[in-house]
Structures are given as structure tokens and as C-alpha cells.
């Protein structure tokens, strides 16, 4: 059993075209599934959950800003990924932890822990989830790109983003209707519990998709990468600096909004 699991996470240089197509399709399905979990633990859903356990506007705003803070870990995660033979194992493991933390948030109101403890638990779970998400972001993107030919990359990413957006919109409407139905019946805690149970099934599909995706062998840099190089190398590239400034401004505007 252990050998079979190890084989699943191994890189391979003998991947057929059919396996490449299947892996790309599974990445799209993974995006459609995972976005449901992210949707019900962010935005209006997160505000409603925090308010339900007794968090005020200020605390809710602080919790909502935690993902931006956690993104700083990407500097260190790039070093970890660059010095590893493959991205799949650590990506799947951290993705599972991320999803489980987000799912547990939905059941916090059921535990009736009191306002302070409940808010603290949600903040810790939310931080851990987005720490894991930020950590694997670089590796997951590289893993995805390794499965797509350069001339098809733009079209594939456009299709993936479109499908994810449709799934996110549809899922948000359905899940919000479910939550509203229970809220109007003064059973909002039960509503979050039902959504949590549905998301457990979605999580199983999500992680199964990630596990089944193949990972091709990638050529690594001969010289090991360290933290200093990871910071210096991008900053010496003018194009990267322009993109960095753009995303900094985008992040500030997005968080204000």
C-alpha cells in the first residue's frame, strides 16, 4: 500500500499524450471544486460566519486581511520547491490541510465555544489555511504549466479560468440560497453545518483530482537556490519589477474595496 502511494506521487518521464490530456482536465475539475470551498469561506460568507460567532466589524476585517499577510511565505516556498525533485507530494499534502482548515471553520458555530474562543479558532484556521495555500501556490502553478505546451498555455489557462468562474458563480448562488433558507428560518448555524457537509464531499473530489494528476520530470537548476537568491533574482528583472508594482497596487485597491 505504501509503495503504491509513493508511486502516485513520483515524477515520470514516460507520460502518454492521453495522460497529459487527462491531467489537464483534472486540473480544471480541481479548480471548479476547490473554488466552492474558497467561496463559502471568504467574502460575504466569511463575514456572516464571523458575525454569527460574535465578531465585530473590525475583527472581521482583520480576519479577511489575513490571506494577504500569509502571501509573504511564497518567498520561502519558492526555495523549497526549487530544491525538490517534484512538486506533487507537498502540493497535495498542503492542499489537503488547507481544505480541511477551511471546512472546520464552517463547523465552529456548532461547537458553541463562546464569542472570543470561536473568533480565535476561526482566525487560526483561516491563517493556517491561507498559509498552506500561499505556500503551494508557486509549486502548483509550475506543476500545471509543466503539463501544457507553450503554444497552448494561453488558451488552456483561459478555459480553466472561465470554467472556474462559472463554477464559482453557480456554486455561490446555490450555496447562498441554501444558507438564506436556513437564516430566514432562524437556523443559520444549521445552514453552515449543511454547507460544511456538502463541501466535505466537494473536498474529496478536489483532492482525488489532484492525486490523480501526473507530474512530468522537470529540469532543475544545478546550483541550489537559497533565500537570498530567491529575493535578488526577481528584483534584478525589470519586467518582474513592473509586475510586482502592478500587483502591489492591485492588492491595496482590492483590500480597500
Regions found by a protein language model. Give the residues of each.
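Short helix-loop-helix connector
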Residues: 53-55, 85, 144-149
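Juxtamembrane helix-start elements in MFS-like secondary transporters
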Residues: 56-64, 118, 122, 192
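Hydrophobic core of transmembrane alpha-helices in multi-pass small-molecule transporters
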Residues: 32, 36, 101-108, 115-136, ...
Amino acid at each position: 500500500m505504501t509503495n503504491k502511494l509513493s508511486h502516485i506521487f513520483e515524477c515520470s518521464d514516460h507520460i502518454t499524450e492521453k495522460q497529459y490530456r487527462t491531467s489537464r482536465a483534472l486540473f480544471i475539475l480541481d479548480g471548479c471544486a476547490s473554488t466552492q470551498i474558497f467561496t463559502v469561506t471568504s467574502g460575504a460568507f466569511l463575514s456572516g460566519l464571523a458575525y454569527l460567532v460574535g465578531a465585530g466589524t473590525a475583527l472581521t476585517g482583520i480576519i479577511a486581511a489575513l490571506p494577504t499577510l500569509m502571501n509573504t511565505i511564497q518567498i520561502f516556498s519558492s526555495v523549497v520547491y526549487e530544491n525538490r525533485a517534484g512538486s506533487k507530494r507537498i502540493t497535495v499534502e498542503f492542499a489537503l490541510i488547507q481544505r480541511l482548515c477551511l471546512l472546520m471553520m464552517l463547523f465552529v458555530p456548532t461547537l458553541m465555544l463562546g464569542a472570543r474562543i470561536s473568533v480565535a479558532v476561526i482566525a487560526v484556521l483561516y491563517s493556517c489555511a491561507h498559509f498552506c495555500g500561499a505556500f503551494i501556490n508557486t509549486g502548483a502553478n509550475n506543476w500545471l504549466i509543466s503539463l501544457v505546451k507553450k503554444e497552448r498555455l494561453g488558451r488552456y489557462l483561459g478555459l480553466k479560468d472561465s470554467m472556474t468562474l462559472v463554477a464559482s458563480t453557480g456554486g455561490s448562488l446555490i450555496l447562498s440560497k441554501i444558507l438564506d433558507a436556513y437564516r430566514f428560518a432562524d437556523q443559520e448555524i444549521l445552514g453552515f453545518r449543511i454547507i460544511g457537509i456538502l463541501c466535505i464531499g466537494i473536498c474529496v473530489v478536489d483532492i482525488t483530482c489532484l492525486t490523480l494528476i501526473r507530474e512530468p520530470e522537470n529540469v532543475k537548476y544545478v546550483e541550489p537556490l537559497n533565500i537570498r537568491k530567491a529575493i535578488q533574482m526577481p528584483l534584478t528583472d525589470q519586467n518582474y519589477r513592473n509586475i510586482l508594482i502592478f500587483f502591489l497596487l492591485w492588492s491595496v485597491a482590492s483590500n480597500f474595496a
